[in-house]
């Protein structure tokens, strides 16, 4: 009986120690919306934010990525290509594409390695005859560390207002390589 009690206490202590050593991730949800009016038709702006986006997308897993590319079709990838050998990252997968109207992709983007689902939607709305209201909606659910929602929103502010908007207004998206 004493042996069984000792084994039971030992097992209980080990399970308590193991439980204390394990840090359970925090699960949460967050979302936000951004918008900016850009010069160009919805189709022109759609084309500028798909295909090769290396001219304005600047957050990467690689120190010197070769290319960022969004394939604007269902099942297409949002790729970061590291080098000529094809090493890289699939940041997300396109789940809805309608040129000049909507692009939606599902994937963790910079949160790769976490148990998180991030759905990002681009919407394109004509403003007058030569401008587009570009709307970005981000919805996320899953493993979310403290401060991550604010960081992700800040990064999107950077992409939209510090990178994409000046890129479009400079006309660089119209220069074909």
Predicted regions: what is each one?
Residues 1-22:
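Bacterial Sec-dependent N-terminal signal peptides
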Residues 16-65:
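Hydrophobic ligand-binding cavity/cleft-lining segments
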Residues 34-36, 68, 90-96, 118-126:
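Hydrophobic/aromatic beta-strand elements that line small-molecule binding cavities or substrate pockets
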Residues 39-43, 95-102, 123-133:
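A short, structured loop/turn motif at beta-sheet edges
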Residues 45-49, 78, 94, 105, ...:
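Hydrophobic pocket/interface hotspot
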Residues 53-89, 176:
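Short beta-edge strand/loop motif at the mouth of beta-sheet-based domains
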Residues 67, 165-177:
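Short, highly charged C-terminal tails/helix-capping segments
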Residues 107-158, 175:
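Beta-strand/loop substructures that line and gate deep hydrophobic ligand-binding cavities in soluble
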């Amino acid at each position: 009986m004493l042996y069984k009690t000792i084994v039971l206490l030992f097992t209980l202590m080990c399970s308590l120690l193991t439980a204390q050593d394990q840090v359970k991730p925090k699960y949460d949800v967050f979302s936000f919306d951004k918008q900016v009016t850009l010069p160009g038709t919805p189709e022109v702006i759609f084309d500028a934010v798909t295909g090769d986006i290396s001219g304005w997308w600047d957050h990467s897993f690689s120190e010197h990525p070769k290319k960022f590319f969004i394939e604007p079709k269902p099942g297409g990838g949002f790729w970061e290509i590291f080098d000529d050998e094809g090493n890289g990252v699939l940041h997300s997968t396109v789940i809805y594409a309608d040129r000049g109207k909507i692009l939606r992709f599902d994937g963790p983007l910079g949160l790769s390695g976490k148990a998180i689902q991030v759905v990002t939607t681009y919407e394109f709305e004509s403003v007058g005859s030569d401008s587009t209201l570009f709307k970005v909606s981000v919805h996320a659910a899953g493993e979310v560390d403290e401060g991550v929602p604010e960081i992700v929103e800040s990064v999107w502010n950077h992409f939209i207002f510090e990178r994409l908007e000046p890129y479009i207004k400079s006309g660089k998206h119209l220069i074909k390589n």
